[in-house]
Amino acid sequence: MTELVNITELLLSRIRDVRDYPEPGVVFKDITPLLADPAAFTALTGALAELTVRHGATKIVGLEARGFILGAPAAVQAGVGFIPVRKAGKLPGATLSQSYDLEYGSAEIEVHAEDLVAGDRVMVVDDVLATGGTAEASLQLIRRAGAEVAGVSVLMELGFLGGRARLEPALAGAPLEALLQI
C-alpha cells in the first residue's frame, strides 16, 4: 500500500494544472513536468508495464499522441510489442480504421492492418481517460483486427466526464486501470 501511495503522490506532484487552457473554464492537466522528471517518468512507465504483464498482454496499443510517449517505454519494459493507433491518414500502407462520434462531429483512428492478429492480447495505453470515445473506438478496432483486449491502462481518469461508464460495455469484462482518479 505504501508503494502505491508513494507513486500516486509522485505522479500527482508532477502534473501541473493550467487554468483556462485550451479554453476559458477548462483546467488542463499538463503532464510535461512528469515526463521531464526521470524518476516520475520511470515510475509511471514501470507501473504501466507491470499492468501490461499482470493482464497477460502481448502488445501495447498507444493512442495518439501521448499514448505513444507512455506506451512505447512501457512496452519495452514489459517485453511486448508496441503498436501506434493514429488519427486517420497518418499511416502509410494498408490500414484498418474505426470511426467514432464526438460531441460535435466524428473522428477516425487507424492501425496498420498487419500489426494486430488473432492470438494477440492487447493493452491500450493512454495518458487520460476523459469521455472514452477514442478508447472505445480502439477496442472496436482491436477486436476487428482479430486480437483480444487485455485491458486499458491510463495515467489518469477524469471521472467527472463519464468515460468509464461509456467504456464499460466495450471492455466486455476487460479491466480499466487508472493510476490516478481526478
Swiss-Prot record:
EC number from the UniProt entry: 2.4.2.7
A Pfam family per the record: Pribosyltran
Superkingdom classification of source: Bacteria
Keyword annotations: Cytoplasm, Glycosyltransferase, Purine salvage, Transferase
InterPro entries assigned to the protein according to its UniProt record, in alphabetical order: Ade_phspho_trans (IPR005764), PRibTrfase_dom (IPR000836), PRTase-like (IPR029057), UPRTase/APRTase (IPR050054)
Pathway connected to this protein: Purine metabolism; AMP biosynthesis via salvage pathway; AMP from adenine: step 1/1
Protein role: Catalyzes a salvage reaction resulting in the formation of AMP, that is energically less costly than de novo synthesis.
Family in the record: Belongs to the purine/pyrimidine phosphoribosyltransferase family.
Protein name per Swiss-Prot or TrEMBL: Adenine phosphoribosyltransferase
Organism (species): Streptomyces avermitilis (strain ATCC 31267 / DSM 46492 / JCM 5070 / NBRC 14893 / NCIMB 12804 / NRRL 8165 / MA-4680)
Organism placement in taxonomy: Bacteria, Bacillati, Actinomycetota, Actinomycetes, Kitasatosporales
